[in-house]
């Protein structure tokens, strides 16, 4: 069976994890946490990079830093993972769901402004499949309305918009190192980028359970105490050690994933040209980090049949998100009419993800491609 995903091991993870154990520093913010943070700051120019226990925690930190609270509204695409909305719901915010673009699952920037009210505080663009949203339009809207922008870059490591790294354009960026991502911190992990100098000190305090502990270890204060809200967002050194091994091989990982992505694209573009399905749309302003290769079928029944057919042929293809605006939680807690978001619903019904991981063999990619051609009778 060709799995949908398989976490890649570089071979150095266990060695670095042993080093972390041997030093006796396990609780975080040690050598490997600092190495990872420095990597992101130096490679991508992020103002401040803060390792977290998950991408969800990075989003929750961003929500706190935006001072989101009861009565505030946050604009989020409906076609996304629940964490994109949940982080702000936990602060008491009301979520305003936006539709996707017609040709890709990203938030439709042209529909954002109509959703803004005097209560709006944050826009959350989600870079689906690592492909950039229209950040020029989004930042222009945010600047004119004095709103925060929190980039959900969970899938977008090493991806760019007009030469700028994703996660480094809005006020905050949030990454995930879950085992399904291009690189992983041992199954779970995340990163918050703080791109506005005004928020760096408070971000460190929130990260350290509401204390100024980070300043204490830098020798800036002679003792530390409780100074603000916060939580236990700091990951273990074991997780950071695992991630460091992955980051050292990031270029190798990316090159292989892009080669697989390109094989899918070349092998299926003619079939897509016949109208059987559509493939990922990469705008000229964006780069492709090969996080995912997906197809958009013509309807739900066709997608269901394709997934079943590929399973019969030994390939693990899967669908993705359900529309959050149609979720049980949202309908139970939402006041007013449920929005109609047809593009989002179409991706929820029709999008299918193909196997994508570093060790996926070329011959297995060809099996998937051939099976899809056979499914459509071509």
Model segments located where?
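N-terminal "arm"/small-domain region of PLP-dependent enzymes with the aminotransferase-like
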Residues: 1-26, 225-227, 355
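Phosphate-binding glycine-rich loop
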Residues: 26-73, 86-91, 97-99, 164
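Active-site PLP attachment segment
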Residues: 168-212, 237
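PLP-dependent aminotransferase class I/II
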Residues: 33-38, 43-49, 110, 114, ...
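Conserved active-site segment immediately N-terminal to the catalytic lysine
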Residues: 151-186, 215-217, 222-227
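Conserved SAM-binding loop
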Residues: 51, 76, 97, 192, ...
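PLP-dependent aminotransferase-like
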Residues: 64-153, 160
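Structural detector of well-ordered beta-strand residues that form the stable sheet scaffold
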Residues: 50, 75, 96, 149-150, ...
């Amino acid at each position: 069976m060709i799995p949908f995903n398989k976490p890649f091991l570089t071979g150095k993870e266990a060695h670095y994890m042993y080093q972390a154990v041997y030093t006796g520093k396990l609780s975080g913010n040690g050598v490997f946490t600092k190495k990872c943070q420095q990597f992101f700051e130096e490679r991508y120019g992020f103002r401040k990079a803060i390792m977290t226990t998950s991408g969800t925690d990075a989003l929750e930190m961003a929500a706190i830093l935006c001072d989101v609270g009861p009565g505030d509204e946050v604009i989020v695409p409906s076609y996304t993972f629940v964490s994109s909305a949940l982080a702000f719901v936990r602060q008491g915010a009301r979520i305003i769901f936006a539709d996707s673009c017609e040709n890709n699952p990203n938030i439709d920037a042209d529909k954002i402004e109509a959703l803004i009210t005097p209560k709006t505080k944050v826009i959350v663009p989600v870079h689906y499949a690592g492909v950039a949203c229209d950040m020029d339009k989004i930042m222009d809207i945010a600047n004119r309305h004095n709103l925060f922008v929190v980039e959900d870059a969970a899938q977008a490591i090493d991806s760019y918009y007009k030469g700028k790294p994703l996660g480094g354009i809005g006020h905050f960026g949030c990454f995930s190192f879950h085992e399904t991502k291009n690189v992983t911190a041992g199954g779970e992990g995340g990163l918050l980028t703080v791109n506005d100098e005004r928020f760096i000190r408070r971000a460190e305090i929130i990260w350290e359970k509401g204390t100024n502990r980070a300043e204490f270890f830098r020798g800036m204060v002679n003792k530390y105490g409780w100074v603000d809200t916060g939580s236990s967002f700091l990951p273990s050194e074991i997780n950071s050690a695992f991630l460091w091994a992955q980051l050292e091989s990031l270029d190798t990982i990316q090159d292989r994933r892009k080669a697989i992505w390109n094989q899918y694209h070349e092998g299926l573009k003619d079939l897509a040209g016949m109208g059987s399905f559509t493939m990922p749309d990469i705008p000229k302003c964006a780069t492709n980090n090969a996080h995912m290769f997906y197809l958009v079928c013509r309807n739900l029944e066709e997608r269901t049949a394709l997934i079943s057919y590929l399973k019969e042929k030994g390939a693990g293809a899967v669908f993705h998100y359900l529309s959050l605006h149609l979720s049980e939680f949202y309908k139970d807690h939402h006041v007013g009419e449920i929005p109609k978001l047809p593009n989002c619903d179409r991706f929820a019904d029709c999008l299918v993800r193909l196997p994508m991981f570093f060790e996926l063999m070329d011959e297995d990619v060809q099996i998937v491609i051939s099976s899809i051609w056979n499914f459509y009778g071509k």
